[in-house]
Each structure stands twice: as structure tokens, then as C-alpha cells.
A protein has these predicted regions:
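Accessory terminal helices/loops
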Residues: 1-4, 8, 166-237
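Histidine-centered catalytic micro-motifs
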Residues: 62-72, 122-129, 181-187
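Active-site HxH/HxHxD metal-binding segment of metal-dependent hydrolases
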Residues: 22, 33-36, 43-120, 199-210, ...
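Active-site metal-binding loops of divalent metal-dependent hydrolases
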Residues: 41-43, 67, 92, 127-128, ...
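Core dinuclear metal-dependent hydrolase active-site scaffold
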Residues: 27, 109-136
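Conserved beta-strand hairpin/beta-sheet module of binuclear metal-dependent hydrolase folds
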Residues: 3-55, 133-143, 148-149
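Active-site-adjacent loop/tail segments of enzyme domains
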Residues: 151, 156-173
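Hydrophobic "anchor" residues on beta-strands that sit immediately upstream
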Residues: 36, 85, 123, 140, ...
Length: 237
């Protein structure tokens, strides 16, 4: 299923929900040049290619939020069709350890030029050491760092709940009208503003890192089940 989640004079962002893990794959299109970037290509690549063809765009860039299999298993099929440049954080490439053909390795704060549109890459560790979010205008593609009303697991290889606490605090300082576009459809709505996240995402309610770590690692998965719903701030302070 395809949904247009952002559309203005300069760029558009379309979301495809694909695969058995309810992944969101995003296609960012620069309207002036008809260049497109696909974020976390995975699962049903023919659907991604079909969307690009329908829009009349050329995929020139692949942006990775992190290196888990469910976010990367379509890379080779995209590269078979398009001569696209692969982008990820250097920290994630080192964690991943895979041989990549001349990817562009970034540091947090770098900017990627997609035609006339500029995309900022943010280093958001926690789920993995080199997890990234992609910030374009008032849209924030968050991968498995932040879901609507949730955040990524920190118990897998490379996960760190202390880093996740710091990351979410930093994201919470972005403009409140920023729209978060998550890597999975785990919730009762597919997007949320940061204002809504700060109000309804329990992981945004903590001021004490130890309480956050205990909740993320030991409590959350026992008391919350999908689809996630907003939870107003209460005992987590």
C-alpha cells in the first residue's frame, strides 16, 4: 500500500508498507530534477520500482537508517536497475562490517543534496551504533530509532538503551511541528508530530536515564502490545 506522506512545491515523500514486518520504505522525490532517494529498500522491490516508474523518477540515491536485514535486503535489486549512490553513517558501516561498493559514508550533521532538495543526516544511536534519521524540511524519517508511540529495541547486537535515552532527548528538541516517519507500522496511526510524540510516546516521558533503561529493557514489552496507542505522561517522570 502506498501513501503520500509529504507533498509540497519542492519535494514529495511516498511511503510503501512492505514485507512481513510491516516495514515502511520511503521514496523522496525532488520535483525539479525528478531525482529520487529510496530509504531502506527491502522486501518487495518490484513495488518500489513500480512506484518510481509511475512517478517518472530516477532513483539516484539509497539512504540507510541502519543495517538490519529487514531494512537492506532490497539494495542489490535496486542497484541492478539504477546506478544509485548508497549512503549511511560511517559508524554503521563499521558495525555492519559488510563489503560495500564505494558507499558514501557520512557523519552526523552531513547534508545530502538530492537535486534542489537538501537532506540532513542525524546520528541517532541506540538501536544500533550508527542508526540515522533523515531530516528534510519538517519531515523526519526515523527508521527504528523512533516509532509512533514507541522506540526501537536496544537488546539486539549493538543496541544501547543509554544512547537511546540521549538520542530521544535530542530528537525531542527539534521543532514540535516536525513529522516523524517511522520504519515500521506498529501503531494506531502511521505518522505523528514531535509535539504528539512528546505528549503520547511513553519513551519521551523519562527524565531519569536509569528509569528509562529499566522500562525499555525489562518492562515495556511485557505491558504494551501492538498496535501502540498514545499514552499520556504519568508515572514515568
Amino acid at each position: 500500500m502506498m501513501t503520500t506522506v509529504a507533498d509540497n512545491e519542492q519535494f514529495s515523500i511516498d511511503a510503501l508498507e512492505l514485507g512481513p514486518m510491516e516495514n515502511f520504505i520511503y521514496l523522496i522525490t525532488d520535483k525539479k530534477t525528478q531525482r529520487a532517494a529510496v530509504v531502506d529498500p527491502a522486501w518487495d522491490v518490484p513495488e518500489i520500482l513500480k512506484l518510481a516508474e509511475q512517478k517518472g523518477v530516477t532513483i539516484t540515491d539509497i539512504l540507510l537508517t541502519h543495517s538490519h536485514h529487514d531494512h537492506i535486503n532490497g539494495i542489490e535489486a535496486i542497484l541492478d536497475k539504477y546506478d544509485a549512490q548508497l549512503h549511511l553513517l560511517k559508524t554503521e558501516a563499521q558495525f555492519w562490517g559488510q563489503h560495500l561498493d564505494l558507499p558514501t559514508l557520512h557523519r552526523g550533521g552531513d547534508r545530502i543534496q538530492l537535486g534542489k532538495s537538501e537532506i540532513e543526516i542525524l546520528h541517532t544511536p541506540g538501536h544500533t551504533p550508527g542508526s540515522a534519521c533523515y531530516h528534510i524540511d519538517d519531515q523526519l524519517i526515523t527508521g527504528d530509532t523512533m516509532f509512533v508511540w514507541g522506540c526501537g529495541r536496544c537488546d539486539l547486537s549493538g543496541g544501547d538503551p543509554n544512547q537511546m535515552f540521549d538520542t530521544l532527548n535530542k530528537l525531542g528538541q527539534l521543532p514540535e511541528q516536525t513529522v516523524t516517519l517511522p520504519g515500521h507500522n506498529y501503531s494506531d496511526q502511521t505518522t505523528a508530530t514531535l509535539h504528539e510524540q512528546c505528549e503520547g510516546n511513553p519513551f519521551m516521558h523519562f527524565h531519569d536515564v536509569d528509569k528509562f533503561v529499566d522500562y525499555r529493557m525489562h518492562i515495556h514489552d511485557k505491558v504494551r502490545h501492538g498496535p501502540y496507542h498514545a499514552e499520556l505522561q504519568h508515572e514515568h517522570e
